[in-house]
Amino acid sequence: MKISIYATLAALSLALPAVAQEGDAAKGEKEFNKCKACHMVQAPDGTDIVKGGKTGPNLYGVVGRKIASVEGFKYGDGILEVAEKNPDMVWSEADLIEYVTDPKPWLVEKTGDSAAKTKMTFKLGKNQADVVAFLAQHSPDAGAEAAPAEGAAN
């Protein structure tokens, strides 16, 4: 009996990081105020969900969308390199959380290039999962947030 209790506790402790990443979309909507200086969330029909800047790409539909794929947006070299090396990679909630926490290390990891640069200098120090949960609400392809296609490198 003791062994099964310990095994259950061990299994639960391994699941905690996954649970801890789940965000609160309502809190994320408020937290997104920090992001709207550069980003907007605008539906394809032109409806503004969050009016914001155009320095960064429109984040409507970002979860489940291919990396660096907003038509007409001028991306930086680092994120373009990620897209080039991982052509089938889409933004997952986990990748977005990691990226908004500190874009530079994420780019270095995904490109393998320690000199990779980002145009996004802002780092979201807390509530990342909440912001990503908010963005996922406005991402019709969020359920398609599949793992990278076979042969695609992370």
From Swiss-Prot:
The keyword Electron transport applies. The keyword Iron applies. Residues 1-20 form the signal peptide. It comes from the Bacteria. Binds 1 heme c group covalently per subunit. One of its GO terms (molecular function) is electron transfer activity. Keywords: Electron transport, Heme, Iron, Metal-binding, Pyrrolidone carboxylic acid, Signal, Transport. This is Cytochrome c-550. The lineage of its organism: Bacteria, Pseudomonadati, Pseudomonadota, Alphaproteobacteria, Rhodobacterales. The gene is cyc.
